[in-house]
Amino acid sequence: MNIKEAKNEIKHTVQAYLNKDYLGDYRIPPLRQRPILLIGPPGIGKTQIMEQIARECKIALVSYNITHHTRQSAVGLPFIRETSYGGETYSVTEYTMSEIIASIYRRMEETGLDEGILFVDEINCVSETLAPTMLQFLQGKMFGNQKIPEGWIIVAAGNPPEYNKSVREFDMVTLDRVRRIDVEADYGVWKEYARERKLHGALLSYLELRPNNFYRVEADVDGLQYVTARGWEDLSQLIYAYEELSIPVTEEVIYEFLHHRDVAEDVEAYLSLYHKYQDDYGIPEILAGNVRTEVYARLFQAGFDERLSVVGLLADGLRGILEKVILQKNKTDQWYDYLRQYQHTLKEGTDKTPAEDYRQMLETIAEENAQLEKTGLVDRKELSRREILRQQMAENAPSAAEPREAFAQAKQGFDNCRSILAAQEQAGEQAMEAAFDFMENAFGNGQEMILFVTELTLMSEAVQFLAQHPCERYLQYNQELLIGTRRRELLDELNQ
């Protein structure tokens, strides 16, 4: 299965394992909660889906790469203790708590979450001295003489032997005690993730043209050449940073991430073209409705790769505009909820002044943000946005003693926030219409239009925006696309 299917399967398993009956006992006893063994190529996102599942299920996550551990850190250190058996005193060996299990209890204390996932990566690549410990871990859910706490689900991951020479195959006795899930690299599924993570538009456009270069592992006379999903994501971050600093992205830099000489050379050439198209076509001008005449003339003569790149640039530019709208709307909605809460407090009345009530609310928000940071249930960007909102609310703290006047003072910042949102929504609507004007004039209802509409359909920012601000032409072309796709499917069925 692909990584998206694996994520859903693991998430469903977590929900099933943590489901309790009316007595508060787990419906599936811990003894029958088989560990999950995830086997797949390196760099396809096994660790990332664990983080996503933990956030979505609102549980804790402890993640370990077991190859970084010795037997002592996994099992614990030995110590001698005196004990009596049958009236005789003996010296026996016991062990301190495993570092891994200790980290689970530490995580529980930090987050206040009693349930979670223990994710152990590269479990089939451990040293010979640690191999028996890993078998005991999978078979008995123990490290040394300590059991994994109840409510904690074991997910282990490893690579197939063709990707790692250090791999040790598990025997049937062990495999019969786990749920093995085999995962393969899938560009279509990864593309959805890449859009959500805002990977660089040049890389996404390149992979639309060269999907076979998404994941490659080859051995030749120069050694192993490889390209992984992780490489594309890390390269994207570097390109953004280099562009901000006006540093050129060379073939050698790309090769450090995409360790395949032909692919690195091809990506470098495409990046140069992509930036040239950015300058030549003037995407911001197109989205503002100001298209130069020579742009259409050039497109009519352009090859398919260039036309496809322009569509990608247009979609990427539109995404940037719509993302600002969505973020501003989320901020406005959150601010509105806090104001409703403050208004309710003022109506109910307390023994504090309106200013003190407002400060109390801000302190509660700060505590909530701190708790979210501890639990890791939201990412850093969301935490940063929450903190910025709290600071802006603090700047609009009321000073009036009369509740009605105090609320009016607190509401001033919100009114400004709402005005900014209205302006951005209008800009988003205009950019959407300008984009369709350009697409119709340049490509009609050709395959480029199909690609553009498909990009919008898969773009989370566009989906959220269009739900609030419908665009007639998007609905028209999307309906035509759905009808055309269904018609082809029916014809294929009849031909069979």
Regions found by a protein language model. Name each.
Residues 27, 32-34, 55, 71, ...:
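Arginine residue identity/basic-tract feature
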Residues 79, 90, 95, 119, ...:
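Phenylalanine-focused residue identity feature
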Residues 8, 12, 16, 55, ...:
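Charged/polar, solvent-exposed surface patches and flexible loops
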Residues 1-212, 217-220:
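AAA+ P-loop NTPase catalytic core and its hallmark functional loops
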Residues 196-352:
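Alpha-helical lid/collar subdomain of P-loop NTPases
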Residues 300-496:
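Terminal-proximal interaction/regulatory segments of ATP-powered molecular machines
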